[in-house]
């Protein structure tokens, strides 16, 4: 989002205040779980997945826009689904390659897997989102860009953590706590910037995009 805003001024064309508040509050909840309990367990997973279900229900019932519906024949619909499935398959293969090679880099460089995950793996798995966002901007589809960014954060924090914690407890080692808290604070600060820009300006300026980029660069610097 910061990189895209630095290139183009992004206008908030839809009401995303509730969405931003939702993800910020749940991100803060995860941060509290890590700080006080050093774990995200089965109980937390149920809360996260229940929140995801409620959000999905809200999304369907209150964010639907019949004006955006277009007439499409069945062939074009099938073609679109096939392209999406093939793209997801390619992403799955690419993600596995990123993880495997990132682990090799961590061993060769003597860098912790946690820091490699926060940097190389996170950047690699975010590239599809970046390209999707840039394509959305070129087409003037700012709503798609905002939905992509907010939706990916919601899936990563709420759905992925929720499902993972149902399978096994996600424990945070004491030596990782400082990094975990730092990342949580960076996350909340970034979303607060988005919230303030939406409330006061209904847009994300190039200057705000630059601030987000500086925060990310500072984050990477602190990791290494």
Language-model segments: which ranges?
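Hydrophobic alpha-helical segments, chiefly the membrane-spanning helices
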Residues: 1-224
